[in-house]
Amino acid sequence: MKLSREISDDGRFVRQPNRFTERLGPPEPGRYRLYASYACPWAQRVLIVRRLLGLEDLLDVTIVDPIRDEKGWRVPGGDPEYLSELYHATDPGYAGRYTVPCVWDTRDKRIVTNDFPQITLDLETSWGTSPNLYPERLRPDVDIMNDRLYHGLNNAVYEAGFSRDQQVYEEAVARVFTTLDFLEVRLAESEYLFDTLTDSDVRLYTTLARFDSVYYGHFKCSVRRLTDYPALWAYARRLYAIPAFHETTDFDQIKRHYYITQTHINPSRIVPVGPELDWGPRPPASARTAAPTTP
């Protein structure tokens, strides 16, 4: 997994920079392919936005196997066999982790971007604008919120789970619950983080969807559960009721990925039973068991 390269001398997890940061060009049907995982919160963001904006015919997608091995993400029945092959085809000297999401240019045979924070913004501004997830009137506020979510929650749960020092771990956990407390107050008075559904809601949802089943126990963010926050829990369930959210949420793949793949935290690879959470009406089985690769 090469995670040791991202642990500082004081035991702090410092996420690697994204290697490929070119902006997505105009949409061209058949040219770009998204490699994503239902298990990964960063990748699920892009899957949600792709579905919300109706970009299925413009951005092809390949779903990788949720169980990552020593070679990285495997592409079931695919060519290449492993995502790492695309990274080395683009940069033969690449030495970092092989991450999803990434966008492959099928014409030029290279990875255009694995810059997960920017991919959704590019789709929202250059590929589709209905619904408008990044409205100009809210962009400064959305940017501020996204930054707060990243440092206080989205990445902070990883800083807690991957930390190698007690104080570093406790500092990360404190940030997580300070952020959740702030969001609980905000969402007690609002349906969304702003007066309309935005990119920020997508970024928050993918962390909330994993919180009780993974981050609470596996990453030791165990002060409170999502279900202990009435407003946040109701908000998460409202978003889950939207097809783009529940069709891209696979709780089984999420749990198996973290508990089986991250053996430095869970060497037994035992996947816990539960928790039993009522997310509301389940989507049709066909939506939850999509083929690994779709055109």
Regions found by a protein language model. Name each.
Residues 1-295:
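C-terminal alpha-helical interaction module
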